From Swiss-Prot:
Lineage, top ranks: Bacteria, Pseudomonadati, Pseudomonadota, Gammaproteobacteria, Enterobacterales
Family the entry assigns: Belongs to the TrpB family.
Gene this chain is encoded by: trpB
Signal peptide extent: none
Tagged with keyword Amino-acid biosynthesis: yes
Ribonucleoprotein recorded as keyword: no
Catalyzed reactions: (1S,2R)-1-C-(indol-3-yl)glycerol 3-phosphate + L-serine = D-glyceraldehyde 3-phosphate + L-tryptophan + H2O
Function: The beta subunit is responsible for the synthesis of L-tryptophan from indole and L-serine.
Cofactor(s) the protein requires to work: pyridoxal 5'-phosphate
GO molecular function: tryptophan synthase activity
Protein name: Tryptophan synthase beta chain
Length: 397
């Protein structure tokens, strides 16, 4: 089987799907390759990003949390995007591709509900029918986002099978698509899954890093020492990293969720603590039991609660171009509180993992002069009840 683009990043990636889905993936790849060369498509995408989503997003210098250190810290404000997170960028691109292929329906999966909301808003805007699979447990945990999706006309389908979380929603969405791909486009929510999705999602998120590079050069006259982003599937991180990969002076740091601590097994850090296997249509590191079953991942943040990781991150890790670390629930929560109290910004719990690592770098070497950028991938409105319940249980409020 030949593809137009390389389906692998080193040994990672590929197209491990039932034969019935190969024509749909090939059609998607063809549409993407032709759209990338089509000035009309690019102009339409750029217009939506600017006038609907609100790009470019700001690069904000932290005023207070760096006090007592020689660190300069900037936040790339994807939280200011319409929809509240970076997810909006690539769904607009995929929805335009769906229209280009003559599809009338969108199928999506969602965990925290952010990708579901983004899929629903893009579908409403472009006149596409939308159905979203969501683990029954997540439907309960994320009721405001479920209501947002329904307000925008999407059908939300709770999935009760398995653990009733994101991985089960992914399985159901793929099952649906294999029977409906002639009329439906599967709007995958992260830079993972079968080729060509990891490449498409990266290209539709790469403006994060492109804007950051131009903005930091304008503000500081040089490139940052490191860019830092949280990694679940890895779309916000690859969007930030892509334009810096060839700038070898810039450190790329991905932050996986350490949950209750790596040693407890209750985490979501397959890159550093998983084994390579086949899942969700790709070859990548994943959390597995001793007999090779997919193990439940865990994080305080539903959006990082994914048992595998995008293949390009696996490749960047394997060649040593990017460093991947983990941050626990407690560390992320502390960073969340710090940003709220000292900068007046409420970050998503996902993004708080990246911020926590930047704070750690700063505090461990206060005398080190360093220029850091954290990708603030989303806003924390969706997380305030989770945080409230934890702080209440601890007697902090």
């Amino acid at each position: 089987m030949t593809t137009l683009l390389n389906p692998y990043f080193g040994e990672f990636g590929g197209m491990y799907v039932p034969q019935i889905l190969m024509p749909a993936l090939n059609q998607l790849e063809e549409a993407f390759v032709s759209a990338q060369k089509d000035p009309e498509f690019q102009a339409q995408f750029a217009d939506l990003l600017k006038n609907y989503a609100g790009r470019p997003t700001a690069l904000t210098k932290c005023q207070n949390i760096t006090a007592g250190t020689r660190t300069t810290l900037y936040l790339k404000r994807e939280d200011l995007l319409h929809g509240g997170a970076h997810k909006t960028n690539q769904v607009l691109g995929q929805a335009l591709l769906a229209k280009r292929m003559g599809k009338s329906e969108i199928i999506a999966e969602t965990g925290a509900g952010q990708h579901g909301v983004a899929s629903a808003l893009a579908s409403a805007l472009l006149g596409l029918k939308c159905r979203i699979y969501m683990g029954a447990k997540d439907v309960e945990r994320q009721s405001p986002n479920v209501f947002r999706m329904r307000l925008m006309g999407a059908e939300v389908i709770p999935v009760h099978s398995g653990s009733a979380t994101l991985k089960d929603a992914c399985n159901e969405a793929l099952r649906d698509w294999s029977g409906s791909y002639e009329t439906a486009h599967y709007m995958l929510g992260t830079a993972a899954g079968p080729h060509p999705y990891p490449t498409i999602v990266r290209e539709f998120q790469r403006m994060i890093g492109e804007e950051t590079k131009a903005q930091i050069l304008d503000k500081e006259g040089r490139l940052p020492d490191a860019v830092i982003a949280c990694v679940g599937g890895g779309s916000n991180a690859i969007g930030m990293f892509a334009d810096f990969i060839n700038d070898t002076s810039v450190g790329l740091i991905g932050v996986e969720p350490g949950g209750h601590g790596i040693e407890t097994g209750k985490h979501g850090a397959p890159l550093k603590h998983g084994r390579v296997g086949i899942y969700f249509g790709m070859k990548a590191p994943m959390m597995q039991t001793a007999d090779g079953q997919i193990e439940e991942s865990y994080s305080i943040s539903a959006g990082l609660d994914f048992p595998s990781v995008g293949p390009q991150h696996a490749y960047l890790n394997s060649i040593g171009r990017a460093d991947y670390v983990s941050i626990t629930d407690d560390e992320a929560l502390e960073a969340f509180k710090t940003l709220c109290r000292h900068e007046g910004i409420i970050p998503a719990l996902e993004s708080s993992h990246a911020l926590a690592h930047a704070l750690k770098m700063m505090r461990e070497q206060p005398e080190k002069e360093q220029l850091l950028v954290v990708n603030l991938s989303g806003r924390g409105d969706k997380d305030i009840f989770t945080v409230h319940d934890i702080l209440k249980a601890r007697g902090e409020i």
